[in-house]
UniProtKB/Swiss-Prot annotation:
Cofactor note: Binds 1 [4Fe-4S] cluster.
This enzyme's EC code(s): 1.17.7.3
Binding site residues for [4Fe-4S] cluster: C270, C273, C305, E312
InterPro entries on file: Dihydropteroate_synth-like_sf, IspG_bac, IspG_bac-typ, NO2/SO3_Rdtase_4Fe4S_sf
GO molecular function: 4 iron, 4 sulfur cluster binding; 4-hydroxy-3-methylbut-2-en-1-yl diphosphate synthase activity (ferredoxin); 4-hydroxy-3-methylbut-2-enyl-diphosphate synthase activity (flavodoxin); iron ion binding
Functional note: Converts 2C-methyl-D-erythritol 2,4-cyclodiphosphate (ME-2,4cPP) into 1-hydroxy-2-methyl-2-(E)-butenyl 4-diphosphate.
NCBIfam families to which the protein is assigned, alphabetical: ispG_gcpE, PRK00366.1
Top-level EC class: oxidoreductase
Ligase as UniProt keyword: no
Pathway the protein contributes to: Isoprenoid biosynthesis; isopentenyl diphosphate biosynthesis via DXP pathway; isopentenyl diphosphate from 1-deoxy-D-xylulose 5-phosphate: step 5/6
Keyword NADP carried by entry: no
Protein's UniProt name: 4-hydroxy-3-methylbut-2-en-1-yl diphosphate synthase (flavodoxin)
Source organism, top-level taxon: Bacteria
Amino acid sequence: MHCESPIKRRLSRKIWVGSVPVGGDAPIAVQSMTNTDTNDVAATVAQIRRLEDAGADIVRVSVPDMDAAEAFGRIKQQVRVPLVADIHFDYQIALRVAELGVDCLRINPGNIGREDRVKAVVEAARDKGIPIRIGVNAGSLEKDLQKKYGEPTPAALVESALRHVEHLDRLNFPDFKVSVKASDVFMAVEAYRLLAKQIEQPLHLGITEAGGLRSGTVKSAVGLGMLLAEGIGDTIRISLAADPVEEIKVGFDILKSLRLRSRGINFIACPSCSRQNFDVVKTMNELESRVEDLLVPLDVAVIGCVVNGPGEAKEAHIGLTGGSPNNLVYIDGKPASKLTNENLVDELEKLIRDKAAEKAAADAAVIVRS
């Protein structure tokens, strides 16, 4: 039951991606990207719906050619979450998906082409009320910047971004967000720090090509955590070579750890030792999988013994501390009941679900009164 985050967020301009606000005082949005063949409409729709169920605020879809653009239009009609079309090389694809109802256009300045092509995309976006993401990536910098800097650097990433920010400014188009991604944590972090000082637009954070589920999670948590703790960032994407649903889970876990956004159960659990009165690892693994469908924010402490157990349990909505002969349960900081190891997970799940329902009803009542 912790207080609000002490982080003071950078004040940015608010834009709208479909129905989702990004920037300003809006919650930090969590994004993912499909990894299906966009031309396989059924598979892509199915994956997007799984991402919706996992809590994705925005989903990006790669649109590599005109056939994929037509497929994108059919996909858009079958999902609820706002969709971003990821466009490279052919600006005409961006023009087509704008006609088909895209919620945001992501273009890469390094490969979209001449300024007149960027202007055409901007005018299409303006006509349809569609925001743009300028997506700069260390792996696809413009050739003149590669020659100037010799290799990708934070300064090169920022220079690439700023030249296209200035272009959109000249076209009087303010509704855009910017990313300056790299697979190197230090390069990405420094680029975002530099850029945050120079523009007012919202920033989309990510460590690109971060890696597999474990290594990518660690790299993203370190890089994005550094920036978010400094108040930088308005929307995030965790790039993992894994099921995209895992990106949403990790994204929300990062935000929860910084108290920037609460969604679902925040578990506090000990690593366990010989003092444990129940199998903490087994209990946690089973409990996490059972209640991952819950969206109500709750703190749940699962501590194996009485050394730190009572202290942690008292600070949670629901706390379990191991003890002999029985384990003690705290509800809202007060001792409530005792549980044996038999059916422990079943009993905890019921307590968590009951508490979640109670909190959801209380929150709804507050909204009605206000």
